[in-house]
Amino acid sequence: MGKVYACSDLHGMLELYKQIKEFLQPEDKVYMLGDMGDRGTDCWETVKAIMNDPQFEVIKGNHEDMLIKAMKDYLRAFDPDPDLFFYSRSGSLLIHNGGMDTMKGWMAESNKAKWFNDLNKLPTHLEYKNKDGKIIFMSHAGFTPYAEDEFPPDEELIWDRNHYLYAWPHDALENAIVIHGHTPIEYIVDDQHRFTRGSYELPKYPLAYWYADGHKCCIDNGAFFTNCTVLLDLDTFEEHKFYTKDYDPEAIWD
């Protein structure tokens, strides 16, 4: 058994995916916590590479959710007239969130229905029990677990941006750790400072942000605008940083 990692929100940054692949050993595994495409430089190619990679197990993110709904509408009502599709509700929502290149890449595929089916089957959460016996829950947006077999609705697992504002409840699972993406670390840090401390000096943002008394960790580095991402080792919690030539070492990210 190799090492087990988590990564999230690559958002079409194919170069970061390629660097991760060079780093991985053949027996390693990566949980990809959603948002493979949209906003970046090689959106559909990144989605294809990750989905076709046996070392990656993918969780559905909100950008996959938007893409799937757009695909469904296209297959049902707009194929083969893509011009009309971009005026539809699902199409315009996806485009507004940086999904134009992702959608056009899919439209050019000859096996569009297969890609739709594969993405539509993605889970909204996964679990991993690490070498120290910690139960690691993973979803795109994050959540607070109260029992091992009870989960919030899929919409919340994919889209929620509220759970990180609250402390770890006394009745939540004590042995649990939640790893997630969705909300870039800088927004979580800024919100928590604003709600708990008033005025503050802007901190240097970490690559992996631990909070809720060490029970939660966000690994969304905003790859499409920071040009960096992190692999988090789920057994040792060691962080491995990857960045493109456009990364600014003087930026406020460690």
Residue ranges and their predicted role:
Residues 1-53:
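N-terminal active-site segment of His-dependent metallophosphoesterases
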Residues 3-11, 135-142, 217-219:
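Active-site-proximal beta-strand elements of phosphoester/diester hydrolases
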Residues 6, 30-32, 58-59, 137, ...:
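Residue-level marker for buried hydrophobic side chains located in beta-strands
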Residues 9, 35, 50, 61-62, ...:
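Divalent metal-coordination and catalytic microenvironments
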Residues 11-15, 38-41, 64-68, 145-146, ...:
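Active-site environment of divalent metal-dependent phosphoester hydrolases
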Residues 43-128, 133-134, 166-167:
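Active-site neighborhood of divalent metal-dependent phosphoester bond hydrolases
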Residues 110-191:
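His/acidic metal-ligating clusters that form di-metal
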Residues 169-254:
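Acidic, His/Gly-rich catalytic cores of divalent-metal-dependent hydrolytic chemistry
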